[in-house]
Amino acid sequence: MMKMKQQGLVADLLPNIRVMKFFGHFVFNYYDDNSSKYLHKIFCCVNLFLLLLQFALCAVNLIIESADVDDLTANTITLLFFTHSIVKIIYFAVRSKYFYRTWAIWNNPNSHPLFAESNARYHAIALKKMRLLLFLVGATTVLSAIAWTVLTFFEHPIRKLVDPVTNETTIIELPQLLLRSYYPFDASKGIMHVIVLIYQFYWVLFMLIDANSLDVLFCSWLLFACEQLQHLKQIMKPLMELSATLDTVVPNSSELFKAGSAEHLRESENQPPPPVPPQGDSMLDLDLRNIYSNRQDFTATFRPTAGMTFNGGVGPNGLTKKQEMLVRSAIKYWVERHKHIVRLVTAVGDAYGFALLLHMLTTTITLTLLAYQATKVNGVNVYAASTIGYIIYTFGQVFLFCIFGNRLIEESTSVMEAAYSCHWYDGSEEAKTFVQIVCQQCQKAMSISGAKFFTVSLDLFASVLGAVVTYFMVLVQLK
């Protein structure tokens, strides 16, 4: 069967999509062929059933051990910790159309021949960073699952029962497993112990990866948007220099049209002037069909005798009408690309905003209980290692999307600074108007909100960290 060639963000994020498919997310698009789609649906349903089964068994164990406050707190933290994964698997399955729409939003971006090199460079940078992010988070997740498993065998778990009548303490040995869980059979020895160990390792690994793969997808979208904003800031200066040719006689102005980036413009300043190319041989005789979204903008024909001729060109700058049109089209390219980025960020917020709200609600409760658990640490042991591991991992999840949300805010607001810093005063009147509009539009930063309740930024991370530290200090004082 013929393989389907992916494009846009789907092609860029294909490794992430494959990870999501392999670990049980309900991604039923983007197959190389349709033969495996049915099998993948069966796998996703079976995987979700196994994950929900172990989650329910842990909940039953929580109810059984609810008499002891410390056991109740520890079991609650475990359930809340893995609630992220269950929520995100179901959330993606229910709202998958929003994710597909976001993946497809960059399938047909506008382009411009003068800035193709800059666009390709920043796209390559974004692609490299997205792959690196996926690798780092994936490696951290696998190492966390391995560390969880190894830590299990450092200490034999026990449970203390206190008789309310005689006040006698009875110690019960528990199965040496990754999770405290109820099973209707003896899982402490024999083949059943091995089977349960394998099942729990599979459960921990899949749950961690299912949650983090969706977080990495969210961060990759924001990373891509930030690099596109970098691209727009980088071409602002050459855009103004190109625009200056429309109003002012510039010697060798045809050199400006060879610039694909600001670096090229700076490199060409000290070069000897090239000979004027014959009419019709200029590199500006390019296909402009991808610059505009409609044909009315570029299908207009110009009379060859229109305007004043100057050195074989049209107008006092020595530019042909087609060259002037190319300069003006560069401004429209910038505006349309910025609108495209805004649409991408809006789609990301629609797809993932409510999941962020659920994540922060669960994390707040988890960190509150972990602060209580931290007051019980009295030495270097398995309890201390597991508590510290929970805290670092939970804060790491919040920091991951907060750092990228904060960068989006910074990059979107710095566009205004880049527009003002370029030589807009040497540009054409329409370029000056363009800079004024850019400064007005970019005063409000692009951002991602958690269903309108909070903005994803480092301020959010700082507030969560500060609240947890304050609560911990209060508990220490009360203790």
UniProtKB/Swiss-Prot annotation:
Transmembrane stretches, start-end: 44-64, 74-94, 134-154, 191-211, 351-371, 384-404, 456-476
Membrane-side (Cytoplasmic) residue stretches: 1-43, 95-133, 212-350, 405-455
Presence of keyword Glycoprotein: yes
Domain of life: Eukaryota
Region (Disordered): 261-280
A GO MF term: olfactory receptor activity
Alphabetical GO biological process terms: antennal development; detection of chemical stimulus involved in sensory perception of smell; detection of pheromone; mating behavior; olfactory behavior; response to pheromone; signal transduction; social behavior
Localization per record: Cell membrane
Gene Ontology cellular-component annotations: plasma membrane
Membrane topology value: Multi-pass membrane protein
UniProt entry tagged with the keyword Cell membrane: yes
Keywords: Behavior, Cell membrane, Glycoprotein, Membrane, Olfaction, Receptor, Sensory transduction, Transducer, Transmembrane, Transmembrane helix
Subunit and interaction comment: Heterodimer with conventional odorant receptors (ORs).
Its biological purpose: Odorant coreceptor which complexes with conventional odorant receptors (ORs) to form odorant-sensing units, providing sensitive and prolonged odorant signaling and calcium permeability. Obligate coreceptor of all odorant receptors. Orco is a universal and integral part of the functional odorant receptor, involved in the dendritic localization of other olfactory receptors. Can form functional ion channels in the absence of an odor-binding odorant receptor. Plays a central role in the perception of olfactory stimuli in ants and is essential for ant social organization.
Family: Belongs to the insect chemoreceptor superfamily. Heteromeric odorant receptor channel (TC 1.A.69) family. Orco subfamily.
Further details from the record: In contrast to most eusocial ant species, where only the queen can transmit genetic information, workers in H.saltator ants can be converted into gamergates (pseudoqueens) that can found entire colonies, facilitating genetic studies.
Protein name: Odorant receptor coreceptor
Organism placement in taxonomy: Eukaryota, Metazoa, Ecdysozoa, Arthropoda, Hexapoda
